């Protein structure tokens, strides 16, 4: 009998949400996603020590200023880990822009181009890279500009329908709507503590976004992210892509039985509405307390891990 991971691959592109090389080799995903937390964890893996040493040596060659060396080494390490992962996957690596730049369009574009340049200098073309940006208004504007220059983007920390709509209207390549973190919020802030997979608020959110994109003919790829359990993944089978942590990839691989397509759009393509203005975006996003909380929380957490990574690098310089 077929295992659920093999079955899921027939209807959805499976992406690994990790920097763990062993997991890549084992589960052979199409693509991989990283973020500051994943890079921080990966930096603790013994096999990656040489990548850290190389990044530090490179940074010392670029500048004699300690603060600049930290920035350079951190960027280079994220790219070095991405390069190792690219040896193991046929598709794309997602590398994230510093979360502290989430409200600065110009700085986000500059950082994205720097990361792309480092990949290009290592022989990797743009079609194997996705630049991850937080789905703030400023992040979406940065992505809109980058897409026009041939740099594809992955808009992350996406919790509200307004964020999803603005991303599609900006023509971004891919969005990562978070499932598990939405569930976390509702469990923490409401009376209901258990949800059937089909009623899971994160699943409902991604389903709504998927249907809206397909109904209006948007090309933006929907990649569900941040899963807490197998039920969420099974309920989103048919989504364009799903990025899954190794523990859940393992669970899927060890579970027998078919996975049925749950997401599909069979209706006619309808006209696209007029794009959201900045004021409309903020008003609509602000109507969703969960999304407001989780976007801010996600940016803070990624910024904290970015700081920890820089501290680790600083101590080694």
Swiss-Prot record:
Top EC class of this enzyme: transferase
InterPro entries assigned: Aldolase_TIM (IPR013785), TAL/FSA (IPR001585), Transaldolase_1 (IPR004730), Transaldolase_AS (IPR018225)
Cellular location(s): Cytoplasm
A GO molecular-function annotation: transaldolase activity
Cross-referenced Pfam families: TAL_FSA
Catalytic-site annotation from UniProt: 132
Keywords linked to the UniProt accession: Cytoplasm, Pentose shunt, Schiff base, Transferase
Keyword Cytoplasm (UniProt): yes
GO biological process annotation, one example: carbohydrate metabolic process
UniProt pathway: Carbohydrate degradation; pentose phosphate pathway; D-glyceraldehyde 3-phosphate and beta-D-fructose 6-phosphate from D-ribose 5-phosphate and D-xylulose 5-phosphate (non-oxidative stage): step 2/3
Function: Transaldolase is important for the balance of metabolites in the pentose-phosphate pathway.
Record text on subunit structure and interactions: Homodimer.
Protein name from the UniProt record: Transaldolase
Organism: Yersinia pseudotuberculosis serotype IB (strain PB1/+)
